[in-house]
Amino acid sequence: MEDINIVIAGSAGEGVQTVGDVLVETIAVHGYSVFAWQEFESRIRGGQNSYSIRISDKPVNAPRMKADILLALNEGACNKYEPLIKQDGILIAQKKTRERMIAIAFSEIAQRELGNRIYINTMVIGALVAAVGMELEVLNHVLTRKFAKKGDKVVSDNLVAAGKGYTLAREGCRGICPWLLPKLDTHYTPIAGKEALSTAAALAGCRFMAAYPMSPSTDIITILSQNEKELGVFTEQAEDEIAAVNMAIGASFAGARAMTATSGGGFALMVEAISLAGMTETPLVIILAQRPGPATGLPTRTAQGDLLFAINAGHGEFPKLVLAPADADDIFKKIMRAFNLADKYQIPVIVLTDQFLLDSIFSVQDINLSQLGPTYYLTDPFKIQDYKRYLVTDNGVSPRLYPGQATHLVTADSDEHDSHGHITEDLSGTVIRMVEKRLAKYRALKGEINPPEEADIEGADKILVGWGSSRNAILEGIELLREDDIRVGMIHFTELWPLPEYRFPESKQYWIVENNTTAQLGRLLRSEYGITIAGVINRYDGLPLTAGYIRRNFNG
């Protein structure tokens, strides 16, 4: 089947997210893959927001901009988003304004026939289910489950509202709606990036999170707080980002796997503490959820502008790990890897996400969570006679105990220290050994870094190179470019520092694809690998990369 792209648009407070969430669940229960992402302004009421839903019988995990169906809840939304409608697409709105559209007076009908305008959203969902040719019975099942705790009358009233919207849309669809989506036996689970990340952190053994709210990272601590009993992660909303990161370091020193989360501005405040974790060799995981900057920037939009900032965060020289998951599936793997390697090498780990990755809803199949489990590296205190917290070893990793674990004295200091953790200024010996010990951890860590993913490299003379959340858009962009007879492949990084030992294929032209203005990955690869960059495809308007954008802006 051809993918179907639905855009639901309206003002903040009109229920755009509610409509989208219920529709996503209905599509998944129907057996189809769904990808959804939201575009919204930085305000609680007003403005115009959208919720885009892409439906397919094949796995889809990337956005498309053009709409097969635009449902506009108000005139302003219609004016803003109508240009997105494909030539053969349709508009669903309250008033007739064009030929290919379904006009349904949702507000008037909800008030007159259902007794309350509150049922507008349920009517809208019913109309969309009808427009794409799905079964009303499946929607009724989803609504019954959603409203079950509110009583039989609420359930009944919403089923009536959904049926009304469904019937009216079916009548309006005649001759203009070509879609028919029968129920399939396949099973997809829709999950938002932030839900995947929160769940993955708990599975990785995280037991403490401190954070100060900053979009787009805020939902992580919200989800963990709301599910504290189920997930077992204690959360603390700190007074600021400096307190949050230091709480996480303290919890880790005390023996708990710990993390914090923030965006660019908050991360700037955390940088000194990252050096503290580097010097005290305390495991720490920081989620850096990127948004456009500088300063406050665009709090509800997406970007990849903090790559070099993350790699270079912290004064002095010490090992750190920087990861950037590509999608929901990869989030589970990278978060587990972040906590395990932070523990193994006793280092800070920065996980680069962004608004698009966290807020988007992905379809996943057959995630075997039982295969995901933490590996702990705390030392057995009963195997140690003379405990030296900073014992010099071949790979730089020293024994690590937490206070109270045994009778051994556990110390740490942000000053340069000796093997016992006591302050030293022995410049001729101890200081050099400690610096070289930390450097040895960097070399050992570098040996564990996975190479970038390669796709369609053979036979391609041009290679698109990206990182993090750009992966699926690049893969779809390759398909479109090959339709234009352009032989193109992909190299994609999700482990960004230390960079892996990797040899770029020769006789290729490399194009950097990033959600920033300065092609930061390109600058990094040029300095570390010496490759020549043939061109760049940058997007920096706050919207995510799409296959169509890549195709339009590739001029190789």
Model-derived regions, located:
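Gly-rich Lys/Arg/Thr-decorated short loops/hinges at beta-loop-alpha junctions or inter-strand turns
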Residues: 147, 171-186, 201-206, 225-231, ...
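Short beta-strand segments
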Residues: 72, 92-94, 262, 285-289, ...
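Flexible, low-complexity linker and terminal segments
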Residues: 190-194, 202, 339, 343-556
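Short, conserved loop/helix-junction motifs that constitute active-site signature segments
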Residues: 82-88, 278, 366, 504-507
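Thiamine diphosphate
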Residues: 2-65, 69-78, 82, 208, ...
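Active-site cofactor/cluster-binding pocket
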Residues: 1-204, 208-210, 502
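Peripheral docking tails and interdomain loops at the edges
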Residues: 12, 107-110, 117, 125-148, ...
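A short helix->loop->beta-strand "cap" motif at the edges of active sites that frequently abuts
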Residues: 85-91, 233, 256, 282, ...
